[in-house]
Structures are given as C-alpha cells and as structure tokens.
Amino acid sequence: MSTDIDFLYRPGFHFTPAKNWMNDPNGLVFHKGEYHLFYQHNPFGTKWGHMSWGHAVSTDLLNWKHLDIAISEDADGAIFSGSAVSIGDEIVAIYTRHTETNQTQCIATSKDNGRTFTKFESNPVLDLDMADFRDPKVFRYEDQWIMAVVKPHEHVCVFYKSIDLIKWEFLSEFGPAAAIGGVWECPDLFPLTYNGEELWVLLISLNPGAINNGTGTQYFVGSFDGVTFRPKYPIEKPRWLDHGRDNYAGATFNDAPDGRRIFIGWMANWQDLGSHPATSWTNAMTIPRELGLTKIGEEIVLTQQPLCSPTYELIIDTTKKHRSGLTGFVELGYDPSTQKIFVDNYTADVKPVNNRIHLKVLVDQSSVELYTSDGVSWITMAVFPQAGVTRALSDFG
C-alpha cells in the first residue's frame, strides 16, 4: 500500500521495484522490442533475503512495466546475480545458484519473452566446488559464448567459452589488479570503438574498498581476442566508473539496438543501507547511461551519457570556488584548489577548458547524479531529504 513517505521518496524517472527489496541489476537484454531488466529481489520483504529475479520491461528505458517474479528461490538455493542472452525466440538466463557452502552457475530458459523460465534439469552447468564463485556475464563472441565470472576473494575474473551454454571450457584469468581492498563482484566485458579502433572494457565491482570508502565499480580498457583480456595501459591505479557512493554492481545490455552499450547500476551501497527510509520498496537503479570512449591526455577513458535530459545545468568559472545546493538536501560544486567537482564529501577530478566547466545534474526525489558534460566524471548519490524540502538549486558562494 502506498504511503506519504513512498510518495516523498519514490523517484519519478529512475526504476524502483513495485514493492520490497531490490539490489543488483541482472539479465539485461534487448529481446523482441523490449528491454528486459531483471534484478535481485526479495519477494517477501524490504530487507535483503530470499534472493530471486524480479522483472520489468520497457521500450524506452525510462517507462517500465512490472512483471511477475521471473526466477524464484527454491530448495536447491537462492538465485544470485547473472546475465541473459537472446537466442531466436528464447531468452536464456545464466545465474549463480547460492547455498551456504557452494556457488554454482546455472541456466534457465524462457519461451514466452521472459515472462516465465524453466530451470535446466541438469543444473549446474559450471561447478568449481567453491563457496564464492559468482555473477556470470555471458555474451556472444564470433561463433561461441564467453562467460566472465569472478572468484571474489581471489580478486580474479575468469573467462570460459561454450558452444551450447551447457559445457564450459576454461580460457584465462585476469587479476588481481588495481583495487583489491574488497571482494570482486559483477564483471562485465564489452567492446567499444574509439577513432575506428575496437577496444574492450572490463567492469569489476568492488565491495568495500572503493574510492568512496564503500562500494564502487572500477574499469579497465584493453583488448580481448576471444581468450584473454589484456589492459591497454600499465595498471598504476584504479579507474572508477563513478565517484559517488551509490553506483554498484552495474551491467550493460546484451543486444541493444544499433550496437549501443547501455549501462544500469544499483543506486545504493552495502555500507549505508540503514539510511533508506521505511518505504514499501527499497532501493533504486541509476539512470540508464550510454557508454563511450574519449581520450584524456595520453589515455582512453570511459564516458557515460544519460538517456534523459538533465534537471539543472551549471557553467562554472574555474578561477573561483563555486558552491550550489539543494536546500536542506546536498551541496555540490567545484573547488579550484583541488580541481575537483564535489557532491557533499564525494569528489571527482575534472579538466577545465578555457577556465570553464560545464556540469549537469539529475535530481529525482531521492537521488542526485552530477556529471560533466563530456560524461567523463560522475558522482551518484541516493539522498533522503526531510519532508518540505523544495529540491530547488541555488548558488551560495
């Protein structure tokens, strides 16, 4: 049942579950004219537990239709994170089955556009007899399927190949590398083009130990030949997809139209879950973002552009300190002494052009996403202001 507090905090253009708990986006795939967003879901309450796959579909990535639970927890285990692929008329989900002592990779098939799934009777399809081995991302590479899956505590992403999604053959490993202060989770690997050159981007989520002292997602730019991922540059420090505290476990859509690479993340973090108000639903997704590449100095870096218009835009003179705010909400701006943009205590490096920075802000009830117009630097935060706050942007020096 909807309440006043639900109305106050439920975003208008970010995805939220109809009710109960949600975390990682799963099984992102475009199939027969619909974007499918599956997600980690507790059907029975607003706290984490009974992990199953919730489900929603959209034709534009902003307006979503809630559907029934797609894959439910059963006596064999909980349904943890994974991915989905489109094969003809079918959607095949590849997910981690979790028990207290073992995590294995399993598959389930839908013949009705993702509305219902049948679990493969010979699951699991990949079992290393490990307590922590999870989050398979599967995609097509030439004439075979590739799986990226992590050994979280070893800080390793493992690659496998398969012809039929059932029999998997080991290919290679990547890691440990860059940030290893927490467990590795939710890998994704995909191609993007820069100036006619195909490059591959590997995403690895980290919990905790990210730049914001909590959860976050690092990325690597490199090459992939169907066997091995090789970074393009020496790995001297992590590169972060987002500098805020609330963008974790994100993934990209398989088979998005026109070859677009579209990302959605979980707009929360594991260190600060107690701050969510007592609504009938818990947590939201980030705004969908189209990914690309650009060059900063001598390195090629990731860019993100939202699939909606900004709420506010700021042109900042970088010779001066600039502070703006949403009254009683958050403070944001630019500090010329550090050359960083900030939202409250979270910062991101920027490179001014002609002493100017063009910032854009998405504000949606209980979230703020600040980003540079080139899409290189982002700060994402879930925030829960008190009732009566106007959420209007104002300058205060």
Predicted features by range, described:
Residues 1, 195, 218-397:
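Beta-rich accessory regions
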Residues 143, 149-158:
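Conserved, charged catalytic cores of large soluble enzymes
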Residues 31, 87, 139-141, 190-192, ...:
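Structural WD40 beta-propeller signal
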Residues 42-46, 98-101, 152-155, 207-210, ...:
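Short glycine/acidic-enriched loop and turn motifs that connect beta-strands
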